[in-house]
Regions:
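C-terminal helix-rich "cap/oligomerization" subdomain common to oxidoreductases
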Residues: 25, 68-70, 264, 296, ...
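Beta-loop-alpha module in the N-terminal Rossmann-like domain of NAD(P)-dependent dehydrogenases
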Residues: 10, 46-111
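A contiguous active-site-proximal alpha/beta segment in oxidoreductase catalytic domains
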Residues: 76, 99-162, 167-175, 180-183
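Short, Asp-centered acidic motifs that coordinate Mg2+ and/or phosphate
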Residues: 30, 67-68, 147
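Active-site loop of classical SDR/Rossmann-like NAD(P)-dependent oxidoreductases
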Residues: 34-37, 279, 323-335, 351, ...
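Contiguous beta-strand/loop segments that form the cofactor/metal-binding neighborhood of enzyme cores
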Residues: 177, 181-301, 333-344, 379
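N-terminal Rossmann-like dinucleotide-binding module
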Residues: 1-48
Length: 379
């Protein structure tokens, strides 16, 4: 059995570990985290047996003979922990975003020697739906690609205003939290084409206000009438995802953001994300428009639609059987990580993670500075 160490055993590690353990090839040997009670709870739910517990990652790596390490800490710690694991030469599963600022991105470029031994948590690129769309593109069925229109209307956006995710000093903001996934699957679909520049804009129209900083729902005089209060959310069947006021002066995060990405051959991608959409308004996917046809796909409905420009024909491909977290991508990433621990190359390398971060940081800078920002990193 392959021996796995975990650094940061939070909810994301918990969900991914379900898939990793399901392969039947891995055991958890060691865990590093600062909250033992939480670790114990998640480990019991995952069915993890005995393991050695640490609060210092370097000590764990020194003492344990590990075949792989899963890093699932908060975002601001990803870079330094990736560098630490790489220094031991151990295969790494690294949560996204791999960095939250330019300085950390530069640090990661120093360990590109570890790129193929790193699986970055980009499950969308390995879903059945994205793999099938790439096959369609490579077949030439839609002809010369003219434009990509991508979108992500997030139905669970409350977490980015009620919980710790609202702190962009920790997360890097919502381009880095959400667009990093979408930019990556777009890069995957476009093959070897390199993005060269980005312009972007964001808006904050709903989740803002003049309520005091640091406010929590329990002590708010408007908790019984606020449409985002926990009691009101439970009434409509929604589990509250935090208790911090989303109409306070310190709410943070955009409500929506859009970016235009230019690629080296002149192609441009239009991407937009929204965190106010709810319930059946959820939508995530893209339209890729070519001379001969258009291929459109939607993750929530797991459908691909191909429109023939030379006739009135339309083909719909239903992939709804591929269920699971991240539309089945987590399962495939888990299998890939096990393969990397056995010596196979990664399907979502550190280089891909850095490129996505560079695009997100360019979008963030473009928003602040109102200019096109070049992307100089190449895979």
């Amino acid at each position: 059995m392959l021996k796995l160490g975990i650094i940061g055993y939070g909810f994301r590690a918990f969900t991914m570990l379900k898939e990793i353990l399901r392969t039947g090839k891995v055991v958890v040997s060691a865990v590093c985290d600062v909250n033992f009670d939480s670790v114990k709870k998640y480990a019991e739910e995952n069915g993890v047996g005995e393991f050695n517990y640490y609060t210092d990652a370097n000590e764990m790596l020194q003492k344990e003979a590990l075949d792989g390490v899963f890093v699932g800490t908060r975002c601001s710690l990803h870079t330094d922990l990736a560098r630490l694991v790489a220094s031991y030469g151990i295969p790494l599963f690294l949560e996204k975003p791999v960095a939250t600022n330019r300085e950390d991105a530069a640090k990661l470029k120093e360990i590109l020697y570890h790129s193929d031994k790193t699986v970055v948590s980009f499950p969308l690129r390995v879903t059945d739906i994205v793999l099938r769309v790439r096959e369609i593109l490579e077949s030439g069925r839609i002809g010369t690609l003219s434009q990509v229109q991508a979108y992500n209307n997030v139905p669970y956006g409350r977490v980015y205003y009620h919980d710790w995710y609202r702190d962009d000093s920790e997360t890097g903001g919502l381009f880095l939290q959400k667009s990093t996934h979408d930019f990556d699957y777009i890069n995957f679909l476009l093959g070897s084409l390199a993005p060269v520049s980005v312009c972007a804009m964001e808006s904050k129209m709903v989740f803002k206000g003049d309520k005091p900083a640091g406010g929590v729902c329990e002590s708010c005089p408007e908790k019984d009438t606020c449409p985002e209060g926990p009691d009101r959310l439970r009434e409509i069947g929604v589990d509250p995802t935090g208790n911090r006021c989303c109409f306070a002066v310190d709410t943070g995060n955009q409500d929506s953001g859009s970016a235009i990405v230019r690629y080296e051959n002149g192609l441009h991608v239009v991407y937009t994300q929204n965190f106010v959409a709810r319930e059946c308004a959820a939508k995530r996917g893209a339209r890729l428009i070519g001379y001969l046809g258009t291929v459109e796909f939607d993750f929530p409905s797991a459908t691909i639609t191909i429109y023939d420009h030379m006739s009135a024909k339309k083909e719909v491909i239903d992939l709804s059987a591929d269920k699971g977290v991240h539309f089945g991508g987590d399962r495939r990433l888990a299998e890939s990580f096990v393969a990397v621990m056995q010596g196979e190359p990664s399907p979502s390398t550190l280089a891909e993670g850095i490129l996505s971060v560079e695009m997100c940081l360019a979008a963030k800078e473009s928003t602040a500075e109102q200019r096109f920002v070049p992307i100089e990193f190449r895979r």
